Design a protein with these regions (language model features):
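Membrane-integrated ABC transporters
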Residues: 1-51, 63-77, 92-100, 113, ...
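Short intracellular "coupling" helices and adjacent cytoplasmic loop segments at the cytosolic face
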Residues: 3-13, 65, 101, 109-133, ...
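Juxtamembrane helix-loop junctions of ABC transporter transmembrane domains
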Residues: 8-16, 39-40, 47-56, 60, ...
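Alpha-helical segments in transporter systems
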Residues: 21-24, 32-53, 57, 74, ...
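Transmembrane helices of ABC transporter permease
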Residues: 29, 33-46, 151-202, 273-286, ...
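An intracellular "coupling" helix at the cytosolic face of ABC transporter transmembrane type-1 domains
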Residues: 32, 117-121, 137-146, 150, ...
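Helix-loop-helix
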Residues: 66-67, 166-180, 189, 250-323, ...
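ABC-type nucleotide-binding domain
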Residues: 337-338, 344-603
Length: 603
């Protein structure tokens, strides 16, 4: 099976119209709120179109005609329509917000679910700061697009059309003269949107970089302080901040050019009416009420037209955010369930690497023709220099990655032909970098089995030599461990991670330097617990300690991407003893790195 590199976070961009349509499609489940909002919008616009006609009647029939009744009734109707318009505006805004917040809720859930499903290869290339910005800031801009921004855009369009028709029906020549500015306004708005959107996206990507820099700085705060690099980090952050500042200035420059131009064009309508309309009134070709109605229509038109530039810029910004959100949602994970993949049933634990080669992101190989077979219940120790491929071997077993060539068989079945979740449910893992979540010790231990009972959790902690130190905390198993477990020592975090693996009760166990950061006494406790845990389970251990190598049923020595030597336990000798006899590389590692451990123990 060939390997394809995953799509990076920044990839080809969808077309603008497609992005807009796709954003709006998220409103479909909430169509009652959307329909209600837009019906109220139409009602609101109808009221806006009626008000100038009522004012015309008050001026021509009431004031000019001397009919006080028309004035009184006209004022009452205007007051009623104003109150009704306020109610419509309130309800429309409320329903729009419900729908748009629901869209944001769905998008955040979709992004989070997608990130859970994407392969390690995607997360290896993506930057955390970028993903956080897209899941929060960009989703909020899409929310604004599907809510008030698009509603206001529709309102402007409906008002322009409605006012244009009303003005044309009143006086054709004056209306045509006034409305000549509309095509120019539309052109400027479209030009402005097309120019502003890529600039807005560039600014957002600079915000990604700034967020990533800040996130990395906060995550490595202890290292920064330990190496006295505060000023250097301040300088790096300032460089990113300057780039963001420059990108925002360029975008705002375009915005500053477009908005005044639109306001200038919109104000020209009032000038035309006063010049030409005044002459028509003097020539008795237009009533004073009609002129007042015209100026009222134009004033109604000017406000939304002036907002058109801001609306277009907001829509352009939101569409750029939509592109970035959909880049995540459209990303394809390299490791997926193949068509026809079936859940993995109970397994014995026989595992075979069959001429497996692997390369990260399709680049140079890190594993080359790895071939070995492990029987159920055996313990396999992997030994080799940094970069020899130990971590890559164990990463292929739970399908964190798929081989570039060859295949991995579990009980004779290609692991790519079973569902990923069912495969991983049979595997317990203790990674080198222990990850604990910002919650209680109990919930961290039960992470792999959320429904585990109290006795099971305590038993797992006891087997991992964690129970005693947990009880030393005032809140015991309810102790909050803080972000990434910062309130615990390295050894304590490792033992909780081991308890988590024990509670899962896997058939296959993977240990990545699981006891590398504990003292001798704690190591002895953990080694005894792991020996009990590994009984009857197929286990893979990246070995750094001689005791692990002596207990292993098989020892694989990796060098330059290949298996340089393999030792197996027999009735006559251990895998360790065999390798000392047949492998010069293993003997060199033993005398340089492993034998000193033995000497320390016997001192």
């Amino acid at each position: 099976m060939s390997y394809e590199s995953p799509a990076p976070v920044r990839q080809s961009r969808p077309a603008g119209a497609h992005v807009l349509w796709r954003c709006m499609s998220y409103l479909r489940p909430y169509w009652p709120f959307v329909l209600g909002s837009y019906l109220l919008l139409l009602g609101n616009n109808g009221i806006s179109l009626a008000i100038p006609q009522i004012i015309r009647s008050i001026v021509d029939q009431g004031i000019r005609g001397g009919d006080i009744g028309v004035i009184q009734w006209g004022v009452l109707i205007l007051m009623g329509l104003t109150l009704l318009r306020g109610a419509f505006t309130f309800l429309s805004g409320r329903w729009t917000e419900v729908a748009s917040q629901s869209v944001a809720y769905d998008l955040r859930n979709a992004i989070h679910a997608k990130l859970q499903s994407l392969s390690f290869s995607y997360h290896d290339q993506a930057e955390t700061g970028q993903l956080l910005t897209r899941a929060v800031s960009d989703v909020d801009r899409v929310r604004f697009l599907t809510g008030r921004a698009f509603l206001r855009l529709v309102e402007v369009i409906v008002l322009i059309v409605g006012i244009s028709i009303s003005m044309l029906l009143m006086n054709l020549r004056l209306a045509l003269l006034t409305l000549t500015i509309v095509p120019f306004l539309v052109y400027v708005a479209l030009w402005f949107g097309n120019r502003y959107r890529p600039l807005a996206r560039a600014a957002q990507e600079q915000l990604d970089d700034l967020t990533t820099r800040l996130e990395q700085n906060l995550r490595g705060a202890r290292v920064v302080k330990a190496f006295a690099q505060e000023m250097a980090e301040i300088g790096r952050f300032d460089d990113q901040n300057i780039r963001l500042f420059d990108a925002n200035v360029v975008a705002s420059r375009t915005r500053a050019l477009g908005l005044p131009l639109m306001r200038l064009l919109a104000s020209a309508g009032t000038i035309f009416i006063l010049l030409y309309g005044g002459q028509l009134v003097i020539g008795e070709q237009l009533t004073l009420g009609e002129l007042v109605a015209f100026t009222t229509y134009v004033s109604q038109l000017l406000a939304p037209v002036r907002r058109l530039g801001m609306i277009v810029s907001a829509v352009a910004l939101a569409m750029a955010s939509g592109e970035r959100v959909f880049e995540i949602l459209d990303a394809r994970g390299e490791v997926q369930d193949l068509p026809g993949a079936e859940p993995l049933g109970p397994i014995e634990g026989r595992l075979r690497f069959e001429h497996v080669s692997f390369a990260y992101f399709g680049r140079h190989r890190v594993l080359d023709d790895i071939d070995f077979e492990v029987q159920p219940g055996q313990v396999v120790a992997l030994l080799g220099a940094t970069g020899s491929g130990k971590s890559s071997v164990i990463s292929l077993i739970p399908r964190f990655y798929d081989p570039t060539e060859g295949r991995i068989l579990l009980d004779g079945q290609d692991i790519r032909h079973v569902t990923v979740n069912s495969l991983r449910s049979q595997i317990g893992i203790v990674l080198q970098d222990t990850t604990l979540f910002a919650t209680t010790i109990r919930e961290n231990i039960a992470f792999g089995r959320p429904g585990a009972g109290e006795e099971e959790i305590v038993s797992a902690a006891q087997d991992a030599a964690a129970h005693d130190f947990i009880l030393e905390f005032p809140e015991g198993y309810e102790t909050y461990v803080g972000e990434r477990g910062v309130t615990l020592s390295g050894g304590q975090k490792q033992r909780i991670a081991i308890a988590r693996a024990i509670l899962k009760d896997p058939r296959i166990l993977i240990l990545d330097d699981a006891t590398s950061s504990v003292d001798t006494e704690t190591e002895a406790l953990i080694q005894a617990a792991l020996a009990r845990l590994m009984e009857g389970r197929t286990s893979f251990v990246i070995a750094q300690r001689l005791s692990t190598l002596r207990q292993a049923d098989m020892v694989l020595v990796l060098e330059q991407r290949r298996i340089a030597a393999c030792g197996r336990r027999t009735a006559e000798h251990t895998a360790h003893d065999e390798l000392l006899e047949i492998s010069g590389l293993y003997a060199e590692i033993y005398y340089r790195q492993l034998r000193p451990q033995e000497e320390v123990v016997f001192r």
